[in-house]
Amino acid sequence: VAAAGLSLAKIGACVGAGLAAIAAGIGIGKIGSSAMDAIARQPEETNNIRTNMIVIAALIEGVALFAIIVCLLALFV
């Protein structure tokens, strides 16, 4: 029973890390798409839009990193 629980923990950690990476990729893709649409509509606001896009993408990457760290902690602790 203990060996089965350990393997399920490994599977769960791997699935969790994968889902976090996939979700971050989708989120950053949507941010990039929306930013390009906004820049096409308002070219004079390019610098503000680009800055906001980079900040939001960094926040998403931070959340994804925390999710992967939690999955790794679940795997090894």
Predicted regions and their residues:
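Hydrophobic, small-residue-rich transmembrane alpha-helices and their short perimembrane loops
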Residues: 1-77
